[in-house]
Each structure stands twice: as structure tokens, then as C-alpha cells.
């Protein structure tokens, strides 16, 4: 992009991306090109005798982060002085506690579910009205919020609870380890259920209502504002130059949307990863009267995002590939192509509608009472010409699109914001058939960007804004995104999929009754149900 200086000036930005399964340090030039990346997998291990726990190992994970930073610098063949700024993003919901001297003392990952009993306990407060109060203020329910975890600590680890002086998110912990400064940003801290959607600041009254300490809330700074600078100690550990600016990052989904240029009211994205997120930018804070949809602060000040989640969509495809497609994996390896590409080629020869096969995996999002039916395929036939791996694979792709369309319809119903097009990103967007199916099911154009994993790019944009290399978050996101292809909906298929969606919804409702009666096991249940 001509408005940005080229890499010959020696200006680069670093994003630290702390995901559920790995941490990455990614270096970008000012045109948004990825120059290098260091990556390390990490594990969140359960605490012995604490069901559902997933501890975040602060010591090991900081060492892994430093390893990634050095790896990225080495791969890019750049001196540390070339990095003009660094920012961090992370999985949301994961929290870190610090003692009163600012030392990190405890952390859990986003998938930590130890506080199921505490979720139920908090739901009963104020004649079962506390969760509604939390949702109307923060856009979050209790199942994934920080308050049940804090209550668990008060019950079972009072030593840590008493020591705690500050709470942040995992992205903020990375920034703290670099700079020594403590703060949170609205996009990530909003997922604690303790931040006001309107003011974009903490709502300590919610903690007080729950009988929890409200004196552990750190300062709130917007994404893209300067937090501090890399300390001499951190520089020695990670290889960055002491004094390098450290800028506020944010939540992975919101920064991913920034990297995709999804920054204006009404814009919509489907992020196709392990989970699929359907995200719609809302012009002002509003919540869903039915509490089906999550509402998060965007990284763009004043804007919120309605977010629905399809559960384990990418994981389901991986399970199908690994459980049933050993032959295709070997063939793809010999051909030098991706197994999913081969499966898509096979599925493309199956008629739209997949001969009526109905996958039962993720439900539409019901944030207040979030659980799913038992995984299954319904309406199979014994005709091997019509019911085979290609048919089942196509049915899974169609079903993922149907669940996404249902979630987008729920958002439109309460917000009045109806998508006119969809940005499709993440690993799922690599599938050309899947992209076309998503266009056909939703009935609107689907745009696929060149950079499909845009979280780190969004984080780098925040770093650049924080030191004045970019003018503003929204403008830069729009300027840096590049499009690979666009899919127009097939109207004939749209009508077919509308009927399939209606049938699937009815069958799924029946399948939930089997879980309710204890005859089958839910794919997943939220803590406290």
C-alpha cells in the first residue's frame, strides 16, 4: 500500500498471539506482509483432584513466548532494533491474578471449567435474576465469566484469593511481562462479564452483588494505546530491545476482525476454526432479550459485536477425516495436496442437499442455556452410491453453513442488523466448496481474504497505531485487507437449503429431548447446567 512506508526503512511490528493451543510471535512489515513467525505449542494441564480445571502455566508459557520471539527475529534475520512496537492478543476468558506487588500468582485458560458449582450458585442470587443483570450490563452470561472462578478461589484457594491485588487477561499478562505495566483492554476484559458495554469500563457493582472483591480491577486502556516499554529484564529474557514500545492489544476474535477489515457497523464475519464464530458489528451496545447471543466490545471504540458460536465445527471435520478417511489421507499425500481439498473434490460431485443426510453436532447458540445434542448422522440410507464418505463430508459442510445462517438470523432478529455480505476467514475458508455452500445457504455474497488467519495482523495494526505508524485502527484494517475471491449465492440452492434448515431445526429439537431424558450424552454442556 503506497500510503505506508516500505520495509526498507527498517520499520517492523511484532504481534504476540496467545491461542488456546499455542503461542506465536509474528513479525509484519508496515504493508501487512508477514515476514516471520515463531510458534510453540503449550498445554493447559488439569490440577489433580480438581475436575474441569485447566491451569495456565505462567512460568513455562513465558519461557515459550520468549523462545518464539527469538525464533521470529532469527527467522526474519532482523536486529531487535527493527521492531518499532509490540502488542499482544490472546484467547478470551482466560484470566491472570497478580499479588499486590504486581507478581503473577495464578492463571487459568479459557477452557477451565472448574467452577460449574459456582456458576449454579451465582445464578440463584437475587431470585435467579443475577445472570440477567450481568448479561444486560456486560453482554456475557456466567458460564464463561470470571466471577465463578473467583468464587471458586474464595472457596478452595483462599490463600490465592486473599493475595490477589489485580486481575488481567492473558494478553495483558504478556504485555505486563514485557513492560511491567498492568492494564486491560475492553475487547478482552469484556469477556469476564464484569465490564460495562456502554462505558467500556469495569462495573464493580457486579462483583459486590456476588459478594466478591471489587478491589482487584486493573486500569482499562483502549486497544492501540501505548502501555509502556520493554524493560531491561524482559529484553534479556526475550531478545527484544529494551525501550521498545509495548502497546495494548486485545481479544483474538476482535483483533481478527480488525485484520479482516470488519470495522464498520453492519459488517459480518464467519470465522471458521475449531469453533465457528459468527460476528456482526452493531452500531451501538444492545443485548438479546432471549440471551441467545453473546455481545462483546469491539476493538473499535463505541462499537460492539454480536457473536454466536458453533461448537467444534472444525474439530468435527478433523474427527471425520481422521476416523474415516485414512485412504484419502494416503492418496492426498501421494498427490501432494491437502486431504480436505481431496475430500472437497469428492463432495463437489454430491448434489446439493447431500441426499437428505442431517448431521447432528453443534446447535445454534443459546447462551443462557447452552448445551448440544449427542453427535450423530440422521437420515442415512443403505445405498452406497448415495450414502458414502463424500456425501457425509458434504453434509457436514452444509450443516456448518446452516448453523451459521441460523445464528446470523438470531442476531438479525434482536438487533435489526441483517448482513448484506459475509467475510469468511479461518481454516474453513480455505475450502472453495465450503465457501460456495456458505453463500448458497445464507443467500448473500461471501468474500474470502488472502490472509485468512488475521488475528496477528490485527494485533500488529494495534501496535502500529500505538506508536503513530498508522493513523487509526479502522482505516488501517480496511487498507491492509486484500481479497482472494468472492462467491455469489446460487438462488436455486438457497431454496433447497432453506427447506433443509427447517427440517434440521425440527430434528435437532427432538434430539435434545434424548439428552434431557438421559438417553444420550450431550456434545458439550456449559458449566452450571
From Swiss-Prot:
InterPro entries: AI-2_kinase, ATPase_NBD, Carb_kinase_FGGY, FGGY_C, FGGY_Carb_Kinase, FGGY_N. It is an enzyme of class 2 (transferase). It catalyses: (S)-4,5-dihydroxypentane-2,3-dione + ATP = (2S)-2-hydroxy-3,4-dioxopentyl phosphate + ADP + H(+). GO terms for cellular component: cytoplasm. GO terms for biological process: carbohydrate metabolic process; quorum sensing. Belongs to the FGGY kinase family. PANTHER family: AUTOINDUCER-2 KINASE, SUGAR KINASE. This is Autoinducer-2 kinase. The gene is lsrK.
Amino acid at each position: 500500500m503506497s500510503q505506508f512506508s516500505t520495509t526498507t526503512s527498517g520499520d517492523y511490528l511484532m504481534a504476540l498471539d496467545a491461542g488456546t493451543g499455542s503461542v506465536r510471535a509474528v513479525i509484519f512489515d508496515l504493508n501487512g506482509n508477514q515476514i516471520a513467525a515463531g510458534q510453540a505449542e503449550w498445554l493447559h494441564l488439569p490440577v489433580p483432584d480438581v475436575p474441569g480445571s485447566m491451569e495456565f502455566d505462567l512460568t513455562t508459557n513465558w519461557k515459550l513466548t520468549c523462545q518464539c520471539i527469538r525464533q521470529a527475529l532469527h527467522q526474519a534475520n532482523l536486529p531487535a532494533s527493527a521492531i518499532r512496537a509490540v502488542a499482544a492478543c490472546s484467547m478470551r476468558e482466560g484470566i491472570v491474578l497478580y499479588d499486590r506487588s504486581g507478581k503473577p500468582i495464578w492463571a487459568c485458560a479459557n477452557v477451565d471449567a472448574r467452577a460449574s458449582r459456582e456458576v449454579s450458585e451465582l445464578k440463584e442470587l437475587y431470585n435467579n435474576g443475577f445472570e440477567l443483570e450481568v448479561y444486560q450490563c456486560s453482554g456475557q452470561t456466567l458460564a464463561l465469566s470470571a466471577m465463578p472462578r473467583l468464587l471458586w478461589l474464595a472457596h478452595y484457594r483462599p490463600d490465592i484469593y486473599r493475595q490477589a491485588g489485580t486481575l488481567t487477561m492473558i494478553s495483558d499478562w504478556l504485555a505486563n511481562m514485557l513492560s511491567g505495566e498492568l492494564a486491560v483492554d475492553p475487547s478482552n476484559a469484556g469477556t469476564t462479564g464484569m465490564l460495562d458495554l456502554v462505558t467500556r469500563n469495569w462495573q464493580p457493582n457486579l462483583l459486590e452483588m456476588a459478594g466478591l472483591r471489587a478491589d482487584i480491577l486493573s486500569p482499562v486502556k483502549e486497544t492501540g494505546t501505548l502501555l509502556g516499554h520493554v524493560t531491561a529484564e524482559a529484553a534479556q529474557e526475550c531478545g527484544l530491545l529494551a525501550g521498545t514500545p509495548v502497546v495494548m492489544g486485545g481479544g483474538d476474535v476482535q483483533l481478527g476482525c480488525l485484520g479482516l477489515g470488519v470495522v464498520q457497523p453492519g459488517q459480518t464475519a464467519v470465522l471458521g476454526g475449531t469453533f465457528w464464530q459468527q460476528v456482526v458489528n452493531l452500531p451501538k451496545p444492545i443485548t438479546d432479550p432471549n440471551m441467545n447471543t453473546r455481545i462483546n466490545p469491539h476493538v473499535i471504540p463505541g462499537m460492539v459485536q454480536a457473536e454466536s458460536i458453533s461448537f467444534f465445527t472444525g474439530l468435527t471435520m478433523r474427527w471425520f477425516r481422521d476416523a474415516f478417511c485414512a485412504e484419502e489421507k494416503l492418496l492426498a499425500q501421494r498427490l501432494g495436496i491437502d486431504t480436505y481439498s481431496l475430500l472437497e473434490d469428492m463432495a463437489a460431485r454430491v448434489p446439493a442437499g447431500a441426499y437428505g443426510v442431517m448431521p447432528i453436532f453443534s446447535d445454534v447458540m443459546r447462551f443462557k442455556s447452552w448445551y448440544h445434542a449427542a453427535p450423530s448422522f440422521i437420515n442415512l440410507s443403505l445405498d452406497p452410491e448415495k450414502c458414502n464418505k463424500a456425501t457425509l463430508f458434504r453434509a457436514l459442510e452444509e450443516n456448518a453453513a446452516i448453523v451459521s445462517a441460523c445464528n446470523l438470523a438470531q442476531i438479525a432478529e434482536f438487533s435489526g442488523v441483517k448482513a448484506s455480505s459475509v467475510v469468511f476467514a479461518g481454516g474453513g475458508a480455505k475450502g472453495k466448496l465450503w465457501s460456495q455452500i456458505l453463500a448458497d445457504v445464507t443467500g448473500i455474497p461471501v468474500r474470502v481474504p488472502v490472509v485468512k488467519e488475521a488475528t496477528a495482523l490485527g494485533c500488529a495494526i494495534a501496535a502500529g497505531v500505538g506508536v503513530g505508524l498508522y493513523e487509526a485502527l479502522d482505516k488501517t484494517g480496511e487498507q491492509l485487507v486484500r481479497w482472494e475471491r468472492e462467491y455469489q449465492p446460487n438462488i436455486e440452492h438457497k431454496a433447497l437449503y432453506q427447506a433443509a434448515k427447517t427440517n434440521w431445526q425440527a430434528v435437532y429439537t427432538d434430539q435434545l429431548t434424548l439428552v434431557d431424558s438421559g438417553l444420550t450424552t450431550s456434545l458439550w454442556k456449559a458449566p452450571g447446567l
